[in-house]
C-alpha cells in the first residue's frame, strides 16, 4: 500500500473504512476501501478475490471504476476512482429545497444505464441506496460497490455494528426468497426515484416486519392475484393485515404522469413483472429532451456552496 498516501477518512462503508488517498507517483486521487472481514485464519477467501477481480472489467461511465485490488496478509484494499460526494449527503445538504425534476430525470436515466450495463454482465448489486450513488460536479452519477455483495455477502450489520439499511430492500428478499434476480436492484431504484422527488425515504422501516408493513400500507398487502407465488415464500404469513393500495398521486403528487407510471413499474410486487433497466430506459418519461446542461449547472452551484 506504499503507493498510496492516505489523505483523510471519508466514511465507513458496509465492509470497512473508506479513505481518500493519493497515488504517490501520479498524484491521482482515489478512494481506498479497506475490507474488514470476519474470516478464518486463512485470510481472504480466494472466491472473493476472484469475484472482485472480475469487477475490474466493469467499465461504464455510470459505474465507479475499480482500479486495483491490493491483497496482503489478511487485508484487502480496493482502489476506486474518487468522487467527492454521495447522493445522500448531497440531498441532506440541500434540505427543504426540491431537486429540480430535470435533474432527477437525468440522475434516474444514468442510474438505469449503469444498472442495465451490470445486469447485462450478470452482476446484481443487492444493496443500492443513496449512500452508494456517487455524484460529481459535472452532473454525473455513478453506482459504487457493484458486485461486492456476491463476493462478501450482505451482512446484517456493518463492521462497526451499524444496522445495514432495509429501506431499499425488495419485498421478495424481506419475505425470505432464496433466489435473487436483477429485479431486486430495480425495486431499490424505484425507492430512490421516489426519495429524490419527495426528499423523504419512501419506506423507512426499522425492522424487517416494519419494513414489509410500510410497503403493504402503501402498495396494498400482496396476494396470489397481485403476486402469484407470494404465499409460498418462506416468511409470508396468512395473518398479515390486509391493506388496500394507495394511489401514487398521494405519494408523489408533483411527479408528472409518465414519471408516476414508471415508478409504478419499478415498484411492481411480482419480480418477474417488474420492469427491467433496459426497458425502463425506453420509457416515455425519458422521451422529452434531457436538459443535461441545466442539470449540470444546478449541481455545480450546489457543489460551490
UniProtKB/Swiss-Prot annotation:
Changing residue 106 to N: In a glioblastoma multiforme sample; somatic mutation. It comes from the Eukaryota. It catalyses: L-seryl-[protein] + ATP = O-phospho-L-seryl-[protein] + ADP + H(+); L-threonyl-[protein] + ATP = O-phospho-L-threonyl-[protein] + ADP + H(+). ATP binds at residues 10-18, 33. The keyword Cell cycle applies. GO terms for molecular function: ATP binding; cyclin binding; cyclin-dependent protein serine/threonine kinase activity; protein serine kinase activity. CDD domains: STKc_CDK2_3. Keywords: ATP-binding, Cell cycle, Cell division, Kinase, Mitosis, Nucleotide-binding, Serine/threonine-protein kinase, Transferase. The keyword Nucleotide-binding applies. Interacts with CABLES1 and CABLES2. Interacts with ATF1. Binding to CCNC/cyclin-C promotes RB1 phosphorylation. This is Cyclin-dependent kinase 3. The gene is CDK3.
Amino acid at each position: 500500500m506504499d503507493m498510496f498516501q492516505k489523505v483523510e477518512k471519508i466514511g465507513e462503508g458496509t465492509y470497512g473504512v473508506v479513505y481518500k488517498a493519493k497515488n504517490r507517483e501520479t498524484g491521482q486521487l482515489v478512494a481506498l476501501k479497506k475490507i474488514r472481514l470476519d474470516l478464518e485464519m486463512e485470510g481472504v477467501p480466494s472466491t472473493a478475490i476472484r469475484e472482485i477481480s472480475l469487477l475490474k472489467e466493469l467499465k461504464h461511465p455510470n459505474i465507479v471504476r475499480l482500479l486495483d485490488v491490493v491483497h496482503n496478509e489478511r487485508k484487502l484494499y480496493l482502489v476506486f476512482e474518487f468522487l467527492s460526494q454521495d447522493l445522500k449527503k448531497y440531498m441532506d445538504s440541500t434540505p427543504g429545497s426540491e431537486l429540480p425534476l430535470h435533474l432527477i430525470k437525468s440522475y434516474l436515466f444514468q442510474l438505469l444505464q449503469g444498472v442495465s450495463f451490470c445486469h447485462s454482465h450478470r452482476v446484481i448489486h443487492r444493496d443500492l441506496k443513496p449512500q452508494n450513488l456517487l455524484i460529481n460536479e459535472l452532473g454525473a452519477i455513478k453506482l459504487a460497490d457493484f458486485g461486492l455483495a456476491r463476493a462478501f455477502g450482505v451482512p446484517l450489520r456493518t463492521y462497526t455494528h451499524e444496522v445495514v439499511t432495509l429501506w431499499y430492500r425488495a419485498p421478495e428478499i424481506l419475505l425470505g426468497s432464496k433466489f435473487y434476480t436483477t429485479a431486486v436492484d430495480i425495486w431499490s431504484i424505484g425507492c430512490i426515484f421516489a426519495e429524490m422527488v419527495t426528499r423523504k425515504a419512501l419506506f423507512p422501516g426499522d425492522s424487517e416486519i416494519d419494513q414489509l408493513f410500510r410497503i403493504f400500507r402503501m402498495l396494498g398487502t400482496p396476494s396470489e392475484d397481485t403476486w402469484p407465488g407470494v404465499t409460498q415464500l418462506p416468511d409470508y404469513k396468512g395473518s398479515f393485515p390486509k391493506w388496500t393500495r394507495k394511489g401514487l398521486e398521494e405519494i408523489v403528487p408533483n411527479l408528472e404522469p409518465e414519471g408516476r407510471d414508471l415508478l409504478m413499474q419499478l415498484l411492481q410486487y411480482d419480480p418477474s413483472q417488474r420492469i427491467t433497466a433496459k426497458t425502463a430506459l425506453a420509457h416515455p418519461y425519458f422521451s422529452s429532451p434531457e436538459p443535461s446542461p441545466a442539470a449540470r449547472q444546478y449541481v455545480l452551484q450546489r457543489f460551490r456552496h
